[in-house]
């Protein structure tokens, strides 16, 4: 609710239109469960795909040519590939859905590289990473949002969604030893926003609160329609990586490398 109010407040303050995109919950929760059962780091790929698809569909609907993204080098410029594989690999996505899912996807908006190219070249829609063009300091940005746009902090990176916050702070850390703070801090150290010593000191504490995590487990299990015991069993499955499942890594790498050469773009990061 807090995250929704943040969005509405910002839209109202900036006098821009607000439109929500509602997913079919039965399909979406089945997808979330499928990725959890696959036991891969990309447990939140259904959310990533839905956001990309919804943004492009709505942009095309209204003839909007630019989508502004908050992705940036300053806080997200460093990320190991095995921590989060390409969400737009539909071979990987579809295999996990068919192997571990129980509901046929009829309404869920998918977004693979074909649709990405369609929207880019036929609809003329571009994703603009505006924060890469200005000096961006996370703490200063948060302060500005609070003071000018009535924004309220929700307790941690990506905790605008309880599920995403849980995945990044607890699931990834316990199953794979992945601590997203290391990636964020590494980027901030490179930009001079944080000292290496400060980052090391902050990493001494766990990325989650034990009491809060237990509450989150109960909440998420209920939302996904499984018992707490079943949810714990899923969480305790041995971890796997995208290479353990069918994927189009080589094909997509070739396509994106060719695209970069044709349009003279440097291979710096996903944004």
Predicted regions: what they are:
Residues 1-271:
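Nucleotide-activated chemistry modules centered on ATP-dependent adenylation/adenylyltransferase
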